[in-house]
């Protein structure tokens, strides 16, 4: 039997406000336990929450970027459950009237575009954290994280493969960091993913029973967890078993998911409007102000890069994986006048070297100005591709310009026709067998002769000119 995968994803986006959603306590990461928990987070009697308006602005910003409806009246609700890191006994969230509804996000899988529906994005507070490793036989509670503002972004179950799920979360990650509403630090919990997975026989309309994989904090873990869960569900069904709705956790050490608890539905949390918080009213003027402050969005910039610089849609998507990378590319492309070459070097050598060194484009040791200098010398045939890589290595490890490195190391490409002709004639005279083979129709023999010329020139001869002159001499 053939199976179809159905995936929906909930992402908890931690907003980068200086203070918490309902108090003035700091949201800074890494402080000593319980040093950043105010009376609101501690749930002391008589203390009332006060909404941080910056949270609302950031939520509107995301809603606009998702081309979603911004609800002009939205309501906070209490989500009731007991857990030691939640002193109030409820979490302040949104249920029936969230701030953002009915959005969409375009993804690219290979060369195929797809639009994923975004059901809603709602504001809520984060819970505290349980500490198990610091106490023998006991657990500690750290409430520093409690009250940190979150946007929970809920997708439609529109994804049909792990590749689509990865493309969606990466596109959302790019968007929230691009908009400046989230710092994107996944190690610190700024972007946490819950993945709902089900399978059904191909052609069946009804969804299968889903299981939710909780708290994934890396794209690699999402890929591993989803692949394992899909295969587990298929194996269970093909063996005659039933998939029970449940919440599961992913164990990176074993690469497997394991049962956490049977899955609750919304009614289990007994949502009701929070009586301590008035409904949030959003005016047209507020939305217009935020819209006017929005940067050019990744999708629009991708289309512009394709039109203005002639890069492929795939390259444009890579170049806009972050705002900093997009700005770096555009600076190089404008300075050098070579959009395609700039894209090739940034998506190729620059990306590989940054990945090797564990760096981000913001930490790139080659400035846009210095890279554009290298690209200009490739474009005007001063450098061959081989020599360009030598110059690139020197650029990475120094602060010199491409021209200074070329001058210092004598790396200028030889394009003088007379000089190349002399080397070609010497190669032809020294390799009569290769000449005979080429004239007999063996194209590879020409490459062997070209290699001899390049060797004689110490890699500095213009490869295209070498090939042209060889063909002229041997025709």
From Swiss-Prot:
Superkingdom per UniProt? Bacteria
Care to name a GO molecular-function term for this sequence? glutaminyl-tRNA synthase (glutamine-hydrolyzing) activity
SMART domains with a match to the protein in the record: GatB_Yqey
Q: Which reaction does it catalyse?
A: L-glutamyl-tRNA(Gln) + L-glutamine + ATP + H2O = L-glutaminyl-tRNA(Gln) + L-glutamate + ADP + phosphate + H(+); L-aspartyl-tRNA(Asn) + L-glutamine + ATP + H2O = L-asparaginyl-tRNA(Asn) + L-glutamate + ADP + phosphate + 2 H(+)
Which EC main class describes this enzyme?
A: ligase
Q: Which residues form the signal peptide?
A: none
The EC designation for this entry is 6.3.5.-
Query: Does the entry feature the keyword ATP-binding, yes or no?
Result: yes
Q: Which residues form a coiled coil?
A: none
The protein's UniProt keywords, in alphabetical order, are:
ATP-binding, Ligase, Nucleotide-binding, Protein biosynthesis
Q: One biological-process term from Gene Ontology?
A: translation
A Pfam family for this UniProt protein? GatB_Yqey
What InterPro entries does UniProt report for this protein, alphabetically?
Asn/Gln-tRNA_amidoTrfase_suB/E, Asn/Gln-tRNA_Trfase_suB/E_cat, Asn/Gln_amidotransferase, Asn/Gln_tRNA_amidoTrase-B-like, GatB, GatB_C_1, GatB_Yqey_C_2, Gln-tRNA_amidoTrfase_suB_CS
The annotated subunit structure for this chain is: Heterotrimer of A, B and C subunits.
Instruction: Show the HAMAP family listed in the entry.
Output: GatB
Similarity field: Belongs to the GatB/GatE family. GatB subfamily.
- What role is this protein assigned? Allows the formation of correctly charged Asn-tRNA(Asn) or Gln-tRNA(Gln) through the transamidation of misacylated Asp-tRNA(Asn) or Glu-tRNA(Gln) in organisms which lack either or both of asparaginyl-tRNA or glutaminyl-tRNA synthetases. The reaction takes place in the presence of glutamine and ATP through an activated phospho-Asp-tRNA(Asn) or phospho-Glu-tRNA(Gln).
**What's the protein called, per UniProt?**
Aspartyl/glutamyl-tRNA(Asn/Gln) amidotransferase subunit B
| Organism name | Chromobacterium violaceum (strain ATCC 12472 / DSM 30191 / JCM 1249 / CCUG 213 / NBRC 12614 / NCIMB 9131 / NCTC 9757 / MK)
The encoding gene: gatB
